[in-house]
Amino acid sequence: MDLNTLYHRTVESWADRVNAVRADQWDGPTPCREWSVRDLTNHVTGEDRWTTPLMRGSTLEEVGDRFDGDLLGDDPIQASLDAAREAIRTVAETLPAGGTVHLSYGEEQMDEYVHQLAADHLVHGWDLAAATGGDLRLDPALVHEVATWFADREELYRAGGVIGPSEAPTGDPQGDFLAAFGRDPHWGPNHAGLARFSAAFGAGDVEAVMSLMTDDCVFEATGPAPDGVRHEGAEAVRAVWVELFGDTGSPAFTEEESFVAGDRGVLRWRFDWVEDDGSPGHVRGVDVLRFRAGLVCEKFSYVKG
C-alpha cells in the first residue's frame, strides 16, 4: 500500500468515528486517561490543522500558537471533519515531491512524518470508538501497514514517553497492535466506569458517585478492625459518603493507580483532610471493586495499617 493511500484511509477511519459521537458523549472518559472524548478529538484535530503548514515548509516558530487551545468550538464534529479533509488534500498534493518537515525534535523526512500521522489516526480512532461504544474493528490492512512501520520504533517511542507500557500480547493482530501502543484491547464500559467513579470521588460529588453504583451496591469500610463495617444498598452507602464528605475538613481523594480486569477493578488512592486544629492528615489505601454493566456493585476498601 502506498503511503498516501495509507494516510488517507487512516484519516477516513478516524473521521467515521468522529462522525458517530453523540452530543452527550463529549465529556466521557477515553483509553487515554488524561483526555475526555472532546480532548482526544481536539488533539487529533490539532494534528490535522498542523499538517498543512508543516507539509508546506513552515517552521514551528512561524506557526506559533495558532493551533493552541480549543479548536472544536460549538460544532466539534464539523470542526474535526473540516480539518481532516484539509489535511488529506495537503498530503496528497505535497507527499509525492518528498522532502523534510520541521518537527519539535528537529527536521524529519516527510515520509516518516506522514507515517506518524497515519499511526496516530488509526490508534486514536480505536480510542474514540472504545470510548463512545463505536465500531472497534480496525481495517486489517491498515493495522498490518502501521504495525510493520512501528515495529522498529516501538521501544524508542516508549523510552521517550510517547506511549505507555506495552500490554500483554493477545495473539490477535489487532489486539497485539493496540498492546504495542500501550492500549488495553479490552478497554470498555468497566474501564470507563472506573474512570468516572474515581473522578467523582476526587470531586467529592456524592450524587455523581451514587449514579455510578448499582441500587444493590455493597461497601465494606476498612474499620473498625478486624473486619470493618459492611453497608448494603444504595441508601446505606450514600449515607456513608454524605458523612465522609460532609463531616471531614477539606476532604480530597487522589487516584494513584488503577486497572481493570474483566468485572473487577483495583483503585489505589490517597485521602487527605484537615483536622479541626488545622493540621493536615492523610491515609493511603486500595479499593477492590466489582462492576456490573459499567456500574460499581461492590467496593471493598483496605487502608495501610
Residue ranges and their predicted role:
Residues 1-16, 20-33, 49, 53-192, ...:
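Structured surface interface patches that mediate subunit assembly and partner/cofactor docking
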Residues 11, 84-91, 194, 201, ...:
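Hydrophobic alpha-helical core bundles mediating ligand binding, dimerization, or RNAP-core interactions
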Residues 14, 40, 197, 209, ...:
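Hydrophobic pocket/interface hotspot
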Residues 38-44:
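Short, solvent-exposed alpha-helical surface patches in non-cytosolic proteins
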Residues 188-215:
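Short, low-complexity N-terminal intrinsically disordered segments enriched in polar/charged residues
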Residues 206-210, 214-262:
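A solvent-exposed, acidic/Ser-Thr-rich amphipathic alpha-helical stretch
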Residues 238-305:
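A beta-strand edge to alpha-helix "cap/lid" segment located at domain peripheries
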